[in-house]
Every structure is written in C-alpha cells, then in structure tokens.
Amino acid sequence: MSAPHADEPRHAPPYRPQALEPRWQSAWRDARLFDADPQPGRPKWFIVELPPFATGQLHMGHARNYVLADADARFRRMQGYNVLYTTGFDTFGLPTELAAREAGCAPERLARECSEAMAAQFVRLGLGHDSRRITQYHVPAYYRWVQWVFLRLFEAGHCFRRDAPVAWCPQCEVTLAASLVDDGRCWRCKRVVSTVVQPQWFVRESTFADEMLDGLDRLAGWPDEVKKIHRDWIGRREGLRLRLPVRGRAHGLALHLDDAGWLPGVRFVAVGRRHPLAAAALRDGVQPGETILLADVAQAAGAAGAVELPIIVEDAPGDAARAGRPDAVGADRALAERHALAAPSPGAGGAPAVCDLDAMLAAGQAERVVGYRLQDWNIARNRYWGPPVPIVHCAACGPVAVPEHALPVRLPEDVDLSRPGNPLEHHARFRDVRCPRCGASARRDAQTLEAYSSPWWYHWMCKRVDVDDPFNRDDANAWLPVDLMIGGADQVRTCFFHVRMIARALRGMGIADVDEPVTTLLALGMVKQDDRKMSKSAGNAVSLASIIERYGADALRLAIIGAAAPENDVNWSDDLVRRQRAFVARLWAFVHRVAETEAGIAAAHDAGDPPAAGRPDALQRRMQDWLATGGRRIAADFRRHDYHLALKNLAFLFERLQAFDAAMRRRAPPRAEDVAILAGATRQLVLFLGPFAPHVAEELWQALGGAGLVAGAAWPGADVVRSSAATAKREAFA
C-alpha cells in the first residue's frame, strides 16, 4: 500500500456527497432551522423566488434561481436576520393541462405528482425553505383568494369584459397568451397560430400608470435596465387625443399622437389586430395575414374641408390605433406603398386636403392630453386548468359576482379532456346555475384566470401558518416589503410588472398597506445549452437529478453560483461542475489535514509539551489580515448580490490558507501557535463556505470539532447584524 501524498491527510474519510448530503438535510429539518415567524426586535429578511411550473423534473434552468436565493437566505441568517424563505408551485396553466392530455391523466394528479417530485429535488439540492408555507396553486384554499382578489378588482371597476382577438392554436385547440406564442407559432406544438375573437376579461393597468411611473425613481434596488423597460412599457406620452368619426359606423376611432406637428402629413390610420375594427373584419372571416385595407374610412377636419383617412389593419399585436404618414420612413412608407396611399401635395389646385389642428380642436376631434402605451391586461383564458372566473352571466342582470361565501368556485374534476375545446363550456353541472342577484337561470363564466393572476402571492407566504387569510395586515406588515425577489429576466414585462400594479390596487382598495412590494429585484440571465435557452420544450434541458447523482449537490451549487454574474446568461457545461467538484475535493483534504495537525498538537500538549506563547510574527499577522479582509469582501459581495465574486473571494482566501500552511510546515516541526491560527482561520473559512456548499460545510465543521450546525451559526467576526434577539439566540464565534 502506497504512502499518502504529502498534501493529503493520513486518515481523511472519503468524500461521498450522495451519503453525507441527505444526512445533513435531515439534521436541518429536525432542527426546524428554516421555520420563520415574526420576532420583534430582530431585523427581518424576506426572500421570494419565482415559483416553477410543475410540469416535470427540475432542470438546470430552474436551479439557478433557487440556488442563488438559498445562498442569500443562508448568508442573511448567519448575519443575524430573521429570514423568511419559502416557495410554491405554479401548478395551474396551459402547460400542465396539455401535459395531462398527452399523459391521459387528470391535471390535478399530474400537478400534485410533479410538485411533490420537485419538492423532493429542492430538498436534495439543499434548499432551506420554510416547508410549512409551501403551497400548490391548484389547491382550492389558495385559489379561493385568487378569485376573491378578482372580485374586489371587478367591484372597484378595475376589471371588465369586452370582445378582443386572441391567439388560437388549432393543433392544441386552446387560446394562447402572448408569452406562449413564439415567432407566430405555438410554443408547444410549433403550429402556426391564428386569431379568433372572444369575450375576454381585462384589468385596467393604465389606471395606475402614473403612480407606477413615478414610483420607479424610488426603486434604488431594481436594475436600471428593468426600470427603463417599465418606463417604455408604460409609455407616457404628452400629445393629442383624436376622436375621428368612421363613415357608416356609430362608434368612432380614438388614437393618440405624440407630437402635434405630425398631424398635417397624416394620410391613413393603422390599427393592430386586436382593435375592435380589426375584430369586426376577423369576425367576417378575414384573416389578417400581413395587412388589410378596410372599407371603413375615418374622417378628420381640415382647413379646406373634411379629410378622408383609409384604415389599415397592420400586422402588429395589440388594440392600438395610430396615425400614419406616407412620407415617414419604415413601416408607414411600406404600408402606404402597398395600398397606394399617396403623400399630400400642397399647392396643387389650391389648398391641400390635410388634417388641421385648429379645425380639429374646434370640431371636438382633437384634445391636448397625456396618453400611454400601456394596454389593459388580459387576465383570463378560454381553457380548463385554472381558477374559474367567479362571475355568473344572467340575461337580465348581466355579469354578476359570485357571493364571497360561495368561494371558491371549484373546478369540476369529472371533465372529458379528450373533447376539443374548453370542457367547462360543456359541463352542465358547472355551467348551469341560478343568478345570485335575481334567481333566474344563468350560466357560469367558462374562462379561467391565467398563470399570472395572483401577483400578490407573497402575501400567502408571509401569513401565519395557522390562518387562511393572506391579507391580514399585521401578518403582512411584519414581513413586507419583500427584501429580495429573484426570477428570470424574461419576467420583466409580466410578473415583475404585475406585482407592482396589483400592490397599488390592493392598497387603493384598502386591502394592503404597501405600494412598492419589492425592495430589491434580481433579474437573472438565462441558462443556455449550446447557446439556446434551456427548456423542456426545446429538448435541451440538463437533468438536475443526474448531475447531483454524479457530482453531488454542493458541487452543482458552486458551479451555478460561480458561472457568471446573476444578471448575465450562462452557457451550461458539465465542466463547470467537474471543476467545482475538484475544488471541494481539495478543500476536503486540506481541512482534514488541518484537523489532524491540530489534534496532534493537542495530543502533544496533553503529554506535557505545552506550546510556547508569544506575539504573532509577520507570517501570523499576514494570515490574520488575509482572514479579516477575505471575510469583509465575501460579506460585501453577498450584500451586493455579486455571489460569483463572493465565491471567488472564498477561493482566494482558501489559497491564502494553503500558502500559510505551506510556510508553516517549512518551519518544521509545526509551531503550536501557527497551528492554532491556521485551525481558527480554517474554521472561519468553513463558516464562510456555508451559504455556498452547506452540506460539505457541515461535515467539515464537524471534522474541526465545531459545535452545533453551520446553518445555525453566526457569521464570523464583527460583520453581523446586531439585535438583542439575535445575540441571545446565537453563539458568538470565538
């Protein structure tokens, strides 16, 4: 048998993450370390991660979100904060419904099984969620409150119903949200989508446009790029509001001009595919294709008489109308040339027939106003798997809210998903009801609320675990606002926008007190495989389970954290994990060797050879400086959410400890004071490691004779949040 390498401990146990990681996960669970309840006098830290769609196994694209959130939670807990960190599972929505159709099972069963499997993977990844607060969004106790908030919006006039074009997939036979249409094709089956007109439910987000715009200046913890996108999305514009009559129609045409100087050159009006005039054309069986020149003509006042403006349905989403000029570059010129709309020619045969601002103001066709690009939020879909819209349609009373005592309106389970279309429309027991107002025969609304319909879900996380009401003010105010929200940058125009809007609506309706619910936002870049976004539908997802089985959860966590800055994309490669596994192996061997050396010095001391005491020499002082500087840098990086830099500083500190160890051993035999300094520094290094690689940190802490759990320990040194409650609860690092 060969002798051990000089850099290896003689009696170090083998590093077997598959065996040790579940053991420490059980220890954390048994100690209830991650249960969070309000503690007066102790600073709080509330972390919210965007929940995964529960349609299968977790992959690397999911893991980045949750590993970074967990690392932040562990750091803040060690800093003395009372940390609330939990999760949920987005078990409603079209992906789950279609997957259930393909599997031939009920969506409820698929959602439950997938979320349970994901929860087990969260544990295996070492995530420290408060398990008491985890929920599945398809549970009636949860979606009762989704319906309750919808009704409050409806009663306050923030929610309304109107006809609108929607994307339709003929293969999947469902309506699609804009986020599920990729380059004109269904995200799942890749079939070209068409457009149909249906009654739709909308939320008036524009009501809150100015408030949301003004509030952006207070969001110091939000990325500048996200705030810029929100400003552009709201699109506040000071210009003209035009109300033009349309020949032969009772209702006119409303549009906005950013600049009154644009008006004289206007020769046509272009409308999006969801505009009511476009909807009328679609209802007559005309598909938009590229563009359509309607028979309808808008009329505007001019200095020399009325000006007729042709109306074109352009190949653009939304329901906006805009004024077009043939002499403009780009889309306007192309539309004008395609439909032979000439530019005005002033001077030929007298005054040209052009729009005139003074004449239009006098005729009541123009008004100086502030307008917005922001459109109403389509919040419901004509499909089965979602919270039913809690409205009853009565011939006499119109749309009537379901009484609060009758909530939740439950989804029927005995539906036939093999039948085309929305099964709720054909389910007589669900559909046919009495009007809550007059008692006449009526029909339930057959639409269901979309996946983003509860952008207040953080209220559910911070309620007491023994109550049902997520809008108890005392519970909410104990934790809100959210200190850190983490999610993909692809949610900038959806979740991250709706979360700000709904907070203002809740405050305005007297339900909640905060208007900016998120103090700091971390918008993550994508995880890619071969330069394509990693996803199950793209067929390039890397299995989380297989990586953990091969390398261990800690190596995977380190690879995710160290791959790039959170806001940057990551092109995934297994080499990232292999390198971190090698790093863990070096650290494992080093710590066990330090433990052996310290034990040897202690044994010699017990045998009557006491170590000599003295002032630290230059080498020892340098080690102490490295340790203090490294700890400060790691903590500062964490506070800035530069987790990748924190890991680099941890690795750099490890190199300094190795350098000290090598210098110490050159002064053979090792001096007791050198060993004491090295052992103390190594203990601190292991504590610093805790947020990154919590399982191996616990194992190494135990090898060094540390008391308690790293997950419950204080951050080394003075760099800790101080409070009477925190100090009383935690051991000081000596």
Task: Give the residues covered by each predicted segment.
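Short hydrophobic alpha-helical runs that function as membrane-insertion/retention elements
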Residues: 84, 342-347
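Structured secondary-structure scaffolds
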Residues: 2-88, 144-145, 199-286, 292-293, ...
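A glycine-rich helix N-cap at a beta->alpha junction
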Residues: 117-130
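Hydrophobic or amphipathic alpha-helical targeting/insertion segments
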Residues: 140-158, 171
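NTP-dependent nucleotidyl-transfer catalytic core
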Residues: 8, 38-46, 77-115, 131-134, ...
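C-terminal low-complexity, glycine/proline- and small-hydrophobic-enriched intrinsically disordered tails
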Residues: 574, 578, 641-644, 648, ...
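Short functional micro-motifs and their immediate structural scaffolds
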Residues: 177, 194-195, 330, 402, ...
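Short, glycine/acidic-rich hinge or "gate" loops at secondary-structure transitions
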Residues: 131, 510-521, 595-616, 664-670, ...
